[in-house]
Design a protein with these regions (language model features):
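A structural boundary signal for the start of the first folded domain, especially the loop/turn
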Residues: 2-175
Length: 175
């Protein structure tokens, strides 16, 4: 009986340790950030606000909204760089990794918007041009936080339109 009691105590301690280990690892399993400031433009509060906006924009749409700042991409084509970044960092929502990513390389002054998975359907070339037409002048003026927020807001509007109308926002149905 004494041996059984000791064995049960050891088993209980082992289970408690396992549960604790799983609980401690949960933050590491949290979703990856949607606003990725590799350049270091934004202070902590701004980054938190932008992240909350991007999460809200993507919520319920199975399409993540990413805003990425980097220093320089050298001579690499910005579209190739952004697509490689997207794939290499396992970005996107769901099995088809749906999303949209706006990247600006501040050192080289290059930018691009790419879509992936369901983001390709939700964001037409027409709509991407509209978004860039709003965002890029703000970037040129150095209004980086406003540019990021505008991008996130326009992506949210686009995803909402797609969800409500069953078709993407395009030149023939733009309100």
């Amino acid at each position: 009986m004494k041996t059984l009691t000791c064995s049960l105590r050891r088993l209980g301690a082992a289970l408690a340790a396992a549960v604790l280990a799983v609980c401690l690892s949960l933050p590491a399993m949290a979703s990856a950030p949607l606003v990725r400031d590799d350049y270091g433009l934004f202070d902590g509060d701004t980054l938190s606000e932008l992240e909350a906006g991007a999460e809200e924009a993507a919520d319920g749409h199975d399409c993540d909204v990413y805003f990425l700042t980097v220093d320089s991409i050298g001579d690499e084509d910005q579209r190739a760089y952004a697509k490689n970044y997207y794939r290499d960092n396992d970005l996107g929502s769901g099995s088809d990794r749906s999303g949209i990513l706006f990247m600006i390389a501040l050192g080289s002054r290059k930018y691009v918007t790419i879509t992936y998975g369901g983001g390709v359907t939700a964001f037409t070339n027409y709509r991407i041009e509209q978004i860039e037409d709003e965002v890029v002048p703000m970037l040129s003026d150095g209004d980086y936080a406003d540019a990021a927020q505008t991008y996130i807001d326009l992506c949210a509007d686009t995803l909402d339109f797609y969800a409500e109308n069953g078709e993407p926002l395009d030149y023939d149905n733009d309100p």
